[in-house]
Amino acid sequence: MSKALGRGAGILLPISSLPSPYGIGTMGRDAYDFVDMLKRAGQKYWQVLPIGPTSFGDSPYQSFSAFAGNPYFIDLDTLIAEGLLKKEEVESYKWADSDDEIDYARIYRQRFEVLRKAFGRSEHKDSRDYVDFIEENEQWIDDYALYMAIKADHNNREWLAWEPAIKKRKPEAMAAYREKLGEDVEFYKFLQFKFYEQWMPLKEYANRNGISIIGDIPIYVALDSADVWANTDQFQLSGSLAPAVVAGCPPDMFSSYGQKWGNPIYDWDVMEKDDFAWWKKRIAASAKLYDVIRIDHFIGIVRYYSIPANGEPKDGYYRQGPGKKLIDAIDSAIGSSKVIAEDLGVVVPEVQKLVKESGYPGMKVLEFAFDGNTANEYLPHNHAKNYVAYIGTHDNDMLKSYISGQSEELQEYMMKYLMANSLDDGAEKMIHALYMSSADTVILQMQDILGKDNSARMNYPSTLGGNWKWRLTKGATWEFTQEHIDKLRDLTRLYGRNRVKTYICKEDIMLKDICMKKYNKEIKDCTNEEIYFALLDMTKKLADGKVSEEGQKKVYYISAEFLIGKLLSNNLINLGVFDEVKQVLAENGKSIYDIEEVEPEPSLGNGGLGRLAACFLDSMATLGLHGDGIGLNYHMGLFKQVFENNYQKETANPWIEADSWLEKTDVTNTITFGNLKVQSRMYDIDVTGYENRTNKLHLFDIESVDESIMEPGGINFD
């Protein structure tokens, strides 16, 4: 399985930043609407920040669990629709003073009050879905729910401040707290049930619409987490269970001071003994939540920066990480999901080697590119294919502030490189340069699409408070407008990043151009029949662009019948343009489903072998196998059998019309039957594979057929 993402584009917008009347983004209606917007904008990816429950400081990278979801993201309107909440009680709270900022303190105080009410009205314990959910997640949910309940009982202090017996998970203490806090434990399980109950349908909806979710997981977990409390042997802790060393990084392009994250560091030697079992569980859980997993601080897998617990970043030192051994464990657990390696920072040759060996795409950030050195690896013209390119991440300046904050010398260099006329034009050209990059995938932050400055920046590394607050607004209309959507869609088409894999925008195959050339009409003025034939032309040209003679061997499937059925929608789907064509038609007041009805239904005959032969051809093309079909073109059509007055009768049944999918070739053969000679000619039909190659079905027809033998009721053999 390829680990590359393929050429595409996406938007980084945290769930927390979605519009919502309840102070923070949720998995409700606005999330689904955003998926629709991504689709219309030709995007393939929605990247989110970590979705776990946040702790003090509100950072999604410091979560109480590597497995749990953030209860803040549970949609309250959905709970209202389920009868668990009343709209008036939800609206009685003031959730925020501003639509574009999250007030985390207020959310913390009020959200759990409301969710407690929903919990009190729920009959989830009687639900088979709930029982199944608990069983499927038993490896983490019991520890997590108990951890959160005990933490709340201890005035939200972390587990190191608990009494020794429960800190060390003594069996008698565990049993006592389960009994004492049973209702609270159940509450936290209920929240996870509701989170997953809302997240999985949202992900499914995104996937159905061609959007993949890129999730972000920190390489390290928080000290204040159920993960560390329940797995102390997996971390480098002291005898008192406090961290002996903590994670961070030395001074770099993100911070001249360096960063001290405070996360405990894994005991990789211990983890290796059970083949990284905890990591496998974590990755498998993440693979259910996301289609693509971005591993933050990937370089820590090769070598990690270890800072004495009481020291500063400059006091730290590098130690060897698990490297390829952990990558192999991840690959064994990840299923069909893919990985992005966040390889930013001080990248040594060992890191570059591991990223290459893993096959994971790395990252490029344009805000690191403009130092005056044309060999800078982050400049778009130096990007390699298997990368994900960003203008900036959540840790960077907004594009507008980044450009204005550079020295005059670098601004001049930047404008020259981008061929920009002004700083504002430079921001626009930077987005074009990103899309133009050779990197397979590009991701834009929503704030940069909207032209925001640093007032909308998500995070300033090495600072506490004031981060992770920005929200997209939605009054009468979304702040992310149709104009933004149209611009992105045009960029994806222009630079071959459209959600579909073909370039429908080329002038000679653009539907509107074909209609104009063929009928001198706009799409909206064409009849359904005219649009049908225009789509035939467009589809044939698209299919022809995917014909290949690659491969030293070729399969020929010979059959008396190939019963292929209607082809228009099948070909549009296989070529990856059905949704785009549907949208173009809708914008012109037409329906793809009405156009489908114009196409005659070719006979499916009276047996199954002809249908099976057609399916074989479709499968070969979809699998990328070099193979064509050879058969007969039924000049007068097939026949169908009916019974009239207890007698069998044959009547004519339509076949493929000559002016539709059949392409006449120059290949002819003279066939001799004794003294009779007949001339045959080969006709071709494109066989499109799903997102793959185009093969051919070669059908031979006799040119000298006397069509007068066909009577209205069929052929009279008497």
Please annotate each region the language model reported.
Residues 2-7, 14, 20, 58-193, ...:
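Alpha-amylase-like alpha-glycosidases and glucanotransferases acting on alpha-linked glucans and related
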Residues 4, 29-54, 288-290:
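Catalytic domains of carbohydrate-active enzymes, especially glycoside hydrolases
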Residues 10, 14-33, 567, 603-607:
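N-terminal catalytic cores of NTP/NDP-binding nucleotidyl/phosphoryl-transfer enzymes
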Residues 13-15, 47-52, 215-217, 296-297, ...:
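Glycine-rich, histidine-containing beta strand-loop boundary motifs that form or position
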Residues 54-57, 220-224, 348-349, 374, ...:
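Beta-rich nucleic-acid/ligand-interaction surfaces
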Residues 188, 192-221:
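Conserved, well-ordered alpha-helix/loop/beta-strand core segments that scaffold catalytic motifs
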Residues 501-718:
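A conserved ligand/cofactor-binding region detector
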